[in-house]
């Protein structure tokens, strides 16, 4: 029988730890918790997808904006395809200015729910599916929290996160959110600071979304 020295035991122990660590990284990735939806550094944008994706878009939306609904209706599925392929990431910047115009709190509630959905357990595809579903159900009174939670579950958001949405748990201050993202929108699109605005973070230019092929051109 071979006698192992203290050095042999140490070497085998180190190799075992290395093998275990390598396997863990292969399965779970280098981070302690991989998240497909993250808050941006200023805390008011939501990065959906990988920060390493070659196409990085910043999209300014208002939950009650009909033109934003048109954008998601036309381009939501191609955006989802880009997210799934890893070629595209979207930083959503939600605004709530239409609450004052319509004398309601729909945009504030929906934006709060969308920030609640930005959880480490939420896949990018689930978040994008929720965005599209919310715009499909756009209405003057808006969905209530239970309705939003049901859409979240159907989109693939974890049940515990959907429960927080249903309860209306606080996730973001709507007024501060609108102020911060409004200032950012004025910065990137001073000539026409409306919603939706799509901004290319790679070229630092506003995207002409009136061109039907804008997304294909960016993704090619």
Where in the sequence are the language-model features?
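C-terminal cap of thioredoxin/glutaredoxin-like
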Residues: 153-220
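Structural alpha/beta surface segment adjacent to cysteine/selenocysteine redox centers
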Residues: 69-146
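A short, hydrophobic/aromatic-rich structural module that often spans a beta strand
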Residues: 139-151, 169-172
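Extracytoplasmic thiol/disulfide redox context detector
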Residues: 2-102, 175-189, 213-220
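Alpha-helix capping and helix-coil boundary motifs
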Residues: 123, 142-147, 158, 210-214
